[in-house]
């Protein structure tokens, strides 16, 4: 057996492991502090987790993908738009790195934004689904936050435009 064949088998096992163990939104045992007010989203990038503070002692935790090295960011913002079945116009930086990308990716199974996007602030970043679920739990994006499609739909139903989002290391 060649080393390339063995590498392909290992990659297949890793990919299947990610598919076989999808994220489950689950209540967290931790209690929110005053910083984590009800209705707020907290993103913990090093842990690759998004927390939605549902109630005083009720936090829903989602597994996410975050910005790769050099693309991470921290700070506070809010949800400025909510879009189901979004089209995506790749920004110039992403098109430069991926010249095969079209100027516009229509909604559907090939769209990197998945089934929904929560646009943050001025629109540079968002919390969105994905067409690459195997990347959830990794440092993979250009700064956006990827979720399993079922998880973004769950979060989408819980938040409104204006919801506060805090991104911490």
Predicted ranges, named:
Residues 8-18:
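Bacterial N-terminal signal peptides
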Residues 21-25:
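Sec/Tat signal peptide C-region and signal peptidase I cleavage site
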Residues 27-71:
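N-terminal secretory signal peptides
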Residues 27-28, 36, 56, 70-71, ...:
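Exported/periplasmic cell-wall-interacting domains
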